[in-house]
C-alpha cells in the first residue's frame, strides 16, 4: 500500500479535510501527510477553521519541498495535488516532474467551467474584459512553452465530476454527495441567500489579485433588497454564510447568519438568492426556485460578473440588478426538467457514479495505484 501525500495551496481546513476524505484514508491505515505550501504560493494567507494535525507539514520555500522530496521514497507515494496550475506555480510543478512524482488531480469544483458557446461568451464582453482574456491567453501560452522546455508533466490521473474533462475518472461533486445523504425536501418559511463573502473572500485577494475594498455599500444594497423580498413574500431572508466568512452578525441587518449548513438551508428554503457560486448546485439538486442577483459593487469585479453572465446563459435564467429593481418583475423560478438534468449530469455526477460515494471511488482507485 502506497503512502498518500496531499499538497495544497491553502492551509488544511475542516472543509478540505471533509471533501477529500482524509479521515477515511487514515482509518483505512493509509500513511497520509498534508503538505501545506500556502506560504510559498500566497505569503501571509490565513483562513478560519484551519486544522492542526500531526500529519501536516508546512513549507514556506520551494527548497524545503525539494529537500523533503529528496529524502522521500517517491516511488512509493501517490501525490494528490491541490495547487492551481498557473505561471505562479510553474516551478513547483517542474520540481515534482523532475522527481518523477506520480501526480493525481481531484477536481472538486466540476461546475466552475460551464459549456457555453464562444459567441455567448463574447456576446456581452467589455473591452477591459477582452484585455484580461488576452492576458490570460498569453500567460497560458507562456506556461505551455515553459512546460515543454522543462518537461513538466501533467497529472497522471484526474478525478472529476465534469463531463467536459476528457480522460477523467468520474466522481461526484461534493454538493451532490451532500444532496445524496438527505434528498427529501420540505418547504420552510424563508428565502436563503448564498453568500460568497464578497468582497473579502481570500480567493479574491490572493488568487484573483483583487484589492481589498470596503463591503459597506455592497452590504447596504443587499439589506435594502432583502427588505423588499421580505415585504413581497412575507418570509425572512436567511444568510448561508460562506465557509471562509468572518461576520460579526450585523452585516445583513437583523437577519440570521448560518455557517456550515448551506445544503440543509437550501433543502428547506422556499427560494434561493445568489450571485454565482458552486453552491448553485444545491438549488438545482433540490429543485428550488432561484434568482441570480447583482448590484453596482458586485459588478466592479469583472471576473465574477462575467462568471454570473455565463451561469445565466447556461441555466437560461435572468440576472436581477437589485439596485434598480421593480419587485413586480422579480420572480425566482425553477429550472425546466431538461435543463436541470443537463446540468446535473454534465457537472455534478454521472449515470455510472450517481449511486456511488466518492469515498468508495477514491479509496478503491488510489489504494491500487
Residues covered by each model-derived region:
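Short, well-ordered beta-strand core segments
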Residues: 79, 103, 158, 272-273, ...
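Short His-centered aromatic/hydrophobic patch
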Residues: 82-86, 276, 293
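N-terminal pre-catalytic "stem/leader" segment of glycosyltransferase-like enzymes
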Residues: 1-124, 200, 205-220, 224, ...
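Alpha-helix C-terminal capping/helix-to-coil transition sites in glycosyltransferase folds
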Residues: 75, 154, 267-268
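A nucleotide-sugar donor-handling region in carbohydrate enzymes
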Residues: 127-207, 364-369
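Catalytic binding pocket for nucleotide-activated donors in carbohydrate/polymer assembly enzymes
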Residues: 278-352
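Donor nucleotide-activated moiety binding/catalytic core segment of transferases
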Residues: 54-69, 173, 180-181, 220, ...
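Conserved catalytic-core segment of nucleotide-activated headgroup transferases in glycan assembly
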Residues: 176-246
